[in-house]
């Protein structure tokens, strides 16, 4: 197992080495199983586009469980109905939004060649997709890089906003603010026009419509459970000519979750995501131009507790 799985001293899974072609992302190890992909969510954590040397125990399992929850909401017809989908040529028709998930069980062909136990609860078996090279960011509240850009320009990714907004204010309507994708290095916020010039207006419009619809439907589900989704990023790909939701969805790594009963604009909010790590690093002496420092054990465990609390509030049951 030592060659297959790498853990840190706290038991967080930092890396996997399965006997299949692998592509390693910031958090996930993606394996090519021939006709499908195996996505393994490690316990790595990234911040400011750097991978930290410290893992967050059980983070990968929590991410997978939350993605599974949201994909199940889509399957149940609570998210993305009658929005439309687009083919690779940008053609559209009214239909439900599809996703790439096949299963969250460890495949038999994988379990036959490695110890499957460390993988249990942290894998997604998915269809292969041609990935759209933009992250589809939706912001319902003004925080993070959006808040910083607004302070400087009064806009976020080319979207003009009213004057006088405070940090974490709710926007009158959610806005679509794409970003370029980067496996390594820094993602870059761009305007919708930049995306449209790259992908074409038809597909860009469809991505915006689908992203806003998923965010709005998911926000209603979260609100029923006392949670606010401040912002999130989606990824899409084309499978057999159909544009569909891929990768993780509405997890603490891709989204900011706040408690509705604690919400108070004008300052940063207590969150159930990795903002806790971001704030710790911002207050440290790290210059963001060099490899980040290890997290103290207390910060890693408090972050794990935040992830777990967010999951349990959302799903309504204890994380096992």
UniProtKB/Swiss-Prot annotation:
Catalytic activity annotation: 5-amino-1-(5-phospho-D-ribosyl)imidazole-4-carboxylate + L-aspartate + ATP = (2S)-2-[5-amino-1-(5-phospho-beta-D-ribosyl)imidazole-4-carboxamido]succinate + ADP + phosphate + 2 H(+)
Region feature Disordered, mapped onto this chain: 283-303
GO molecular function terms listed in the Swiss-Prot or TrEMBL record: ATP binding; phosphoribosylaminoimidazolesuccinocarboxamide synthase activity
GO-annotated biological processes: 'de novo' IMP biosynthetic process
Pathway: Purine metabolism; IMP biosynthesis via de novo pathway; 5-amino-1-(5-phospho-D-ribosyl)imidazole-4-carboxamide from 5-amino-1-(5-phospho-D-ribosyl)imidazole-4-carboxylate: step 1/2
Similarity comment text for this entry: Belongs to the SAICAR synthetase family.
Stated name of the protein: Phosphoribosylaminoimidazole-succinocarboxamide synthase
Organism, scientific name: Rhodopirellula baltica (strain DSM 10527 / NCIMB 13988 / SH1)
